[in-house]
């Protein structure tokens, strides 16, 4: 795994530096591409590259947070090291909403391919809404929403709807 230094410089100049100057708090979770090892989130790119920003909060373990008046369970990439802890956090959470980097079976990864393995969505039945990254294509089942990536990365991303999402904590 590697970091494109030009992209990192662009992201810092045009995203992280600007949001820091504006006083915006950023919450980010570790995903499978930012974790260096397959079985742990401990060594990860977002922690190592963004720790200089006091406004950036990085989550490598499932954590309940509160934004405005909404409790949200943040769930980073689930691996062999954090699986039991994550399941316990899901069970104990009083949040209505989950935001994570989750690999559910039965959802479109990209056009023409549906994931036939992964976590069963029933594990998240107690939550009103689940928002996730990981799959590049937007899809949902009415409760679980894969947000897709904001721009085309691969040829199979071509012509899919892209962009950013704004989350309203009040409605």
List the predicted regions and their residue ranges:
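Core catalytic region of metal-dependent phosphoesterases/phosphodiesterases
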Residues: 1-64, 123-127
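Active-site environment of divalent metal-dependent phosphoester hydrolases
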Residues: 2, 27-39, 65-66, 79-82, ...
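Short, glycine/charged-enriched secondary-structure capping and boundary segments
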Residues: 5-8, 41-45, 87-89, 111-115, ...
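Active-site-proximal segments of metal-dependent phosphoesterases and phosphodiesterases across multiple
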Residues: 8, 79-88, 93-127
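Divalent metal-coordination and catalytic microenvironments
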Residues: 11, 31, 72, 101, ...
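Residues at the starts of beta-strands that form the adenosine-phosphate
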Residues: 25, 71, 95, 128, ...
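Active-site-proximal beta-strand elements of phosphoester/diester hydrolases
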Residues: 69-78, 97-101, 145-148
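Conserved beta-sheet core of the metallophosphoesterase superfamily
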Residues: 110-170
């Amino acid at each position: 795994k590697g970091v494109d230094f030009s992209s990192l410089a662009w992201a810092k100049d045009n995203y992280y530096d600007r949001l820091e100057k504006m006083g915006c708090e950023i919450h980010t979770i570790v995903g499978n591409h930012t974790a260096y090892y397959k079985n742990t989130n401990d060594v990860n790119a977002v922690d190592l590259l963004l720790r200089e920003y006091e406004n950036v909060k990085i989550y490598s373990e499932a954590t309940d947070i509160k934004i405005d008046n909404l409790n949200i369970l943040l769930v980073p990439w689930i691996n062999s090291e954090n699986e039991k802890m994550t399941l316990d956090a899901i069970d104990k959470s009083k949040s209505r909403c989950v935001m994570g980097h989750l690999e559910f079976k039965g959802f479109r990864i990209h056009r023409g391919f549906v994931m036939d393995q992964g976590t069963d969505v029933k594990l998240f039945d107690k939550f009103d809404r689940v928002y996730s990254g990981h799959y590049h294509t937007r899809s949902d089942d009415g409760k679980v929403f894969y947000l897709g990536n904001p721009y085309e990365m691969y040829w199979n991303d071509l012509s899919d709807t892209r962009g950013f999402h704004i989350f309203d904590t009040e409605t």
